[in-house]
Amino acid sequence: MVGPLLKENVEEVMKSNTSLNVLALNQPGKVENRPNLCYFALSPEDEARDAARHIHNQGKQTPLLLVPRGALGDRVVSAFADEWLKLGGGTVLQQRLGSTAELKSGVNGGGISLTGSPVSTLPSSVDSSLGSPGDVPVSSGGSIDAAYIVATPEQIGYIKPLIAMRNGSQSNVTLYASSRSAQGTSGPDFRLEMEGLQYSEIPMLAGSNPALMQQALSAVRNDYSLARLYAMGADAWSLANHFAQMRQSPGYELNGNTGDLTATPDCVINRKLSWLKYQQGQIVAAN
C-alpha cells in the first residue's frame, strides 16, 4: 500500500494495525518502528537535515539559520539543529525573517546582519527579524561561517543583497538555500545576483534524468513544486518495489529522482539531495 499523504491519515493507518506493507507518503510527529511500515516525505525537515549534512561535510563550524517566523521556521530549525548535533556539531544560531514586504522595506535600512540567537536557548515565542537587537554575535567561540536560508525566489532576491549590504560582498560566510528558493524561473540577472549561493535540489531537477524532468515539467506546466511531487510519485513506485530491501537491509540505497534514498532503522527514508551553485551567471554542481 502506497500512502496516505496527510499526516493525520498516516496516524490512522498506524492505529489500524494493518498487516499490509505500507509506504506512508508523510512522516508523523512520532515515528513507530514496525516491520511493515516505511515513511517517505518531501518535507522542509527532510531538506534541512540534508542541508546540515552537506554544510558539515564542507567543513563549516558555526551555521546561522535564516528562516521565516512561524511554524515553517520552527520545523526547519528543529530538524537542522537535531541533525547538526548528531554530526558532532556545536552551536547553531537562528535569525527569523519577516514577510516579503518587510524584506523589501529593509532595502532602505541597514541590511541583514549575520548574527543570531543560539537555537537551544531561544524560546520559540521569541522571534527576531532583520538583525534586531535581540540577536547576539556568537557564543560558541567562533564566527559564523555558513548561513542556510529558507525563502521563496522573490524573498531571496532581497535577502542576498541585504546580506551583502550589511556584511560586504566579499564576506567569508558561505550562503546556502533550500529548494524553496529555486522554482526554475531564474533569469540571467537573478543568477548573477545569486553568485556563490549553493542550493539543494532533487536530482531529477538537477539534470540526473532529463527525459523524466521534461515529462514532469510538461505535465505540471513548469511548476517546480508540483514537479517535485511528480518525482516523488516515481520514487514511491520504486520504493514500493524494493520495500523488503529498504526495510531489512541496512545501508541499502536507491538512486531516486528525489534523492539518493536510504532508510533509518525506523524506515524513515532519508534523501541525499543534489547541491547546485550559481557561478558567473550559470548553475553548476556544487558538490
Regions found by a protein language model. Give the residues of each.
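Short beta-strand elements at the ligand-binding edges of bilobed clamshell
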Residues: 31-54, 191-203
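Second-shell loop/turn segments in exported
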Residues: 36-42, 62-70, 94-97, 134-137, ...
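Periplasmic-binding protein-like
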Residues: 1-5, 23-25, 64-68, 116-153, ...
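Short beta-strand elements in bilobed, periplasmic/extracellular small-molecule ligand-binding domains
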Residues: 34-37, 85-122
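Extracellular/periplasmic periplasmic-binding protein-like sensory domains
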Residues: 37, 117-122, 142-146, 160-234
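An alpha-beta-alpha
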Residues: 39-98
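Beta-alpha junction/loop-to-helix N-cap segments that form part of ligand/metal-binding clefts
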Residues: 1-31
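Segments of small-molecule ligand-sensing domains
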Residues: 180, 216-286
